[in-house]
Amino acid sequence: MNDYFSPEEIRTLMSRCESDRQRIILFLLYNYGLTVEEALEIKSGQFMKKPDYLLFNFTRKLTGKSHTYKIQYENYRLFYKVLSKLQDQETVLHKDRHLPISDTILRKDLFDLAVIMNRKITSAQLFESHLYWLFKKGVSFAQGVEEYGLALSGKPFKIWESAMLSGRLWPFLLE
């Protein structure tokens, strides 16, 4: 279990982040299981602002499945603050309004968080933690394969196996 970040650990990590960008990176990679490439391409136009929540429209690159996620509570405030400064076609993850961040900057943000927490944090580890908690919730391995385009064997199967052996306990993700 120590190999995977729990939702509580991610909440703690988000509270210790130095920037909104780091919080958004953690939220997107952990809560929705996005890849680094998918996170870098998110535009502010993919979010629909409502009075108490945001709707986030997203299509997975690998599987082509489209989703609409509801973002609310403290994460709503975080995204609303960032989105209110952007035009529809500007990327959400950016250094300043006119300079989107690169893969290297995103990985540096994760490294900075790892230094703060004195623990290794990678995008792959965040995705594996996302899968672990989904499987622990009771999502089947077949659903994971269909949704994320997972390999039928190897690491994803071991994550599923580990989640099944630990029982079904579901602390809510970040919402």
Where are each of the predicted segments found?
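Basic, Lys/Arg- and aromatic-enriched nucleic-acid-binding interface segment
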Residues: 3-34
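Short, leucine-enriched amphipathic alpha-helices that occur as contiguous helical runs
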Residues: 6, 10, 21-23, 103, ...
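Short, charged phosphate-coordinating catalytic segments
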Residues: 29-52, 143
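Short, charged amphipathic recognition helices of the HTH superfamily
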Residues: 35-36, 41, 92-93, 99, ...
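Short, basic interhelical loop/turn and adjoining N-cap
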Residues: 45-49, 101-102, 149-158
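Basic, alpha-helical nucleic-acid-contacting "clamp/cap" segments
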Residues: 50, 59-96
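Short, basic (Lys/Arg/His-rich) helix/loop patches that form interaction surfaces
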Residues: 108-146, 150, 166, 172-173
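DNA/chromatin major-groove-contacting recognition/catalytic segments
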Residues: 157-175
